[in-house]
Amino acid sequence: MEHIGKKVTVFGSFVVDLMGRTPHLPAAGETVKGTVFKMGPGGKGFNQGVAAHKAGADVTMVTKLGQDAFADIALNTMNELHMDTGRVLYSDTTETGCALIMVDENSSQNEIVVILGACNTITDQEVDSLEDLVGQSEYLLTQLETNVSSVERIVDTAYRKGVKVILNTAPV
């Protein structure tokens, strides 16, 4: 892959996707036997980082993880993709997020419950510690799968530093 040389900071979510396929989505109170289960990396922020990496950008991923097996999945995946993980934050009190995804194998309709976990606990002080990183970036990519106050603060920092901001308003 050609390296485009753009320095991109991605500020956002990482969750582990837990996906099950079923013959139909369950009604309230119903249990449905699934046919396939898959587990893998996800989250809108992480997905932005993967897309930027595949486009050839130099990506630094900023998210917050717990101290758990899902955090290991996050770091292993990011390292395999050669993303800079030096600014990943950690929580001692909250677990890494996950998404519970049910997919109807006939219609492909889905239902998703996302538990944002640690990436929803990013503090003002943690955002402030990223000012130099943001200032060295050409782009800041972010979305609304972390606490909104942290997104507002990091976007304000980027604007002050003259950094281009791409805000995906998902999951709204």
What spans do the regions from the language model cover?
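Ribokinase/PfkB-type carbohydrate-kinase core domain
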Residues: 2-14, 64, 76-90, 102-172
